[in-house]
Amino acid sequence: TICRPNESIISKEYLCYFMRSSAYYKRLLGSVTGTTRKRISRKNLGNVELEVPSKEIQMDVVEQLDCLVKVIESRKQELQLLDNLIKARFVEMFGDLAAPDCRWRTLHLYEACESADGIKCGPFGTQLSKDEYQSAGVAVWEIPQINNGFTSLPTHYLTNEKANQLSAYSLISGDIAMSRKGNVGKCAVFPKNFPDGIIHSDVLRIRVDHDRVLPLFMMYQLHFSRAVQYQIESVSSGAIMAGINVSKLKNIIVHVPPIQIQEQFTTFAEQIDKSKVVVQRALNEAQILFDSLMQQYFS
């Protein structure tokens, strides 16, 4: 559907931001038809109402939001450049892990873990319900925190009693937390200075044997290795939303170079990661401000 605004009343830039807002989405939901494939008629789309301020106010709103969009995109580019730097070092030190002549020892991922229970999926069903979430207590770590490298605070917590009941699903320093749904394979190492928490049902925990595999090396192998990425994509299922389970993840083949070489890479990556944390927090702040202004202007 093409939307061509009357620019004597509303600018296309202002209308575009409105159509990106949660308020617009909520208003559309009431007119959406279909279950598997949702759709909306042109008539219903045209009947969505919005408040239209003066052209001067519209211009001011667009300028503020445009500025924040530029900041957000700039921060994302910085993160990508830092990731590229780490990836270049990874390839320089370990080569192409998908190459047939790769010389490093291989193991199933479960063999690189400290125990048979090293790879764990978060609690399901009656083990943890949303009604048990608290506003403070022991953190429940979810996909959004993994996506930004644990630079944002959790949104759900548990009582100490409930967390003790779910101690088998704990997340401790050095654990690798991986998204098992949607953005499958996205992962982050749980920081040293964070209190222990519990993983959400959409999260997989990988607890490696530190005598053989360093967490940061393994995390970047999961991110950068074409061989690993291909395996994860191959075993991820779901027509609407991709997903991976524990048994499939356990049998992923990974490479295990000598620990001394892993240490050299980890030292380099840790320095770059310090810069990534600063940039990611700046990105989080800019995104929060953008979301807040969108709510303020279009709610």
Stretch-by-stretch model annotation:
Residues I2-P5, I57-D60, Q64, K87, ...:
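Feature detects amphipathic, helix-rich regulatory segments
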Residues Y24, N183, D202, V228, ...:
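A generic "binding-loop/recognition-motif" signal
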